[in-house]
């Protein structure tokens, strides 16, 4: 799978955080399609952390939260696809995700196969709770290899936080985009700092594997995100900088 331009779409985290469910995802898919943003290339709808049960099933498989996703992920994936969109999900390199749901450490192949069976098109793979003494390069290579053999094209988003000299090895993992920064907070100071930090990393950005400057915060005046927010001019500048620097727009 070759990715020729920075992926674009929408991720649930900055709006809903862990408070996500089937109806909210369907409503978001409806809104993306009705707005025409999909026609402009915003075609990925990605569910972030917090979607699963707290334990795997007896076969070691991830299980969607039964109360919040009563019809399962394949049904939800089919709904998103019916709107002309692509369906994305979240996991983590560790035993646990950042929000303490089951991660994919040592379950990479079974999880990749599960995601393929659910019709997943995009995997955000976070860096929280990384096992001590295990290098990120190995962890991302494991999932990259698992996705390469799962029988489905799944865009691999390595959310590696820009640590551990990721730029030097990320293209050996099969990732199509990689987090080249720490988390973006909802403030002018944070987005300005991140934009400036990316200048030296531009040689690593391009077709096949794009530098991800974190999810957009445009228009998020009233959210639970850290930071005091921005004014509209600052949000517009934020969007322009992400475009100029070739970041995915999610």
What residue spans do the PLM features occupy?
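Second-shell loop/turn segments in exported
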Residues: 12-20, 64-66, 101, 130, ...
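Structural recognition of the beta-strand scaffold that forms the well-ordered cores
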Residues: 2, 7-12, 41-48, 86-91, ...
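Glycan-recognition surfaces
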Residues: 107-110, 149-250
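Extracytoplasmic/secreted proteins, especially bacterial periplasmic and envelope-associated proteins
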Residues: 20-27, 31, 71-75, 110, ...
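Extracytoplasmic, non-cytosolic globular domains
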Residues: 122, 128-154, 161-162
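Non-catalytic accessory regions flanking glycosidase/transglycosidase catalytic cores in CAZymes
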Residues: 1-41
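Active-site beta-loop-alpha junctions enriched in small/polar residues
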Residues: 13-15, 50, 92-96, 128-130, ...
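Aromatic-lined carbohydrate-binding/catalytic grooves of carbohydrate-active enzymes
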Residues: 28-132
């Amino acid at each position: 799978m070759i990715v020729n331009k920075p992926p674009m779409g929408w991720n649930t985290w900055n709006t809903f955080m862990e408070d996500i469910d089937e109806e909210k995802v369907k409503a978001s898919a409806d809104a993306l399609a009705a707005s025409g943003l999909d026609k402009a290339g915003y075609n990925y709808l990605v569910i972030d952390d917090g979607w699963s049960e707290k334990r795997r099933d007896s076969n070691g498989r991830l299980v969607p939260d039964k109360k919040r996703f009563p019809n399962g992920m394949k049904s939800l994936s089919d709904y998103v696809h019916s709107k002309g969109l692509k369906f994305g999900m979240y996991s983590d390199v560790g035993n646990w995700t950042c929000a303490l749901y089951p991660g994919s450490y040592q379950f990479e192949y079974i999880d990749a196969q599960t995601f393929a069976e659910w019709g997943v098109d995009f995997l955000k793979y976070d860096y929280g709770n990384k096992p001590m003494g295990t290098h990120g390069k190995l962890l991302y290579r494991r999932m990259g290899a698992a996705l390469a053999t799962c029988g489905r094209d799944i865009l691999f988003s390595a959310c590696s936080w820009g640590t551990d000299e990721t730029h030097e090895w990320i293209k050996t993992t099969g990732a199509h985009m990689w987090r080249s920064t720490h988390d973006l907070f909802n403030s002018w100071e944070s987005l300005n700092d991140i934009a400036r930090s990316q200048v030296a990393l531009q040689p690593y950005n391009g077709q096949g594997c794009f530098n991800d400057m974190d999810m957009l915060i445009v228009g998020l005046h009233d959210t639970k995100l850290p930071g005091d927010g921005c004014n509209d001019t600052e949000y517009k500048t934020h969007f322009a900088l992400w475009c100029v620097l070739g970041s995915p727009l999610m």
